């Protein structure tokens, strides 16, 4: 499971719909999450723009944990 809150919440919701977290990519302030549809075996993407996080501290935490 992902460590930071926004991704954790998204992951939990998508898991309820039959998706499994695979990977992420952070580029130019956009966090793209990759999921596998466990029913059909397809890979889907979800984009989260971290610039929308209001807290600078939370943004820094998102970057730090994604880079681990």
Set out the residue ranges of the language-model regions.
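Compositionally biased, intrinsically disordered low-complexity segments
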Residues: 10-12, 25, 51, 65-66
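Mixed-charge, Lys/Arg-enriched low-complexity segments
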Residues: 1-8, 56-68
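N-terminal acidic leader/helix
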Residues: 2-23
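Acidic, low-complexity, intrinsically disordered interaction modules
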Residues: 18-61
């Amino acid at each position: 499971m992902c460590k930071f809150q926004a991704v954790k919440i998204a992951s939990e919701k998508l898991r309820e719909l039959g998706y499994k977290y695979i990977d992420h990519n952070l580029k130019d302030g956009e966090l793209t999450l990759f999921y596998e549809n466990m029913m059909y075996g397809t890979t889907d993407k979800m984009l989260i723009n971290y610039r929308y996080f209001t807290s600078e501290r939370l943004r820094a935490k998102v970057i730090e944990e994604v880079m681990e």
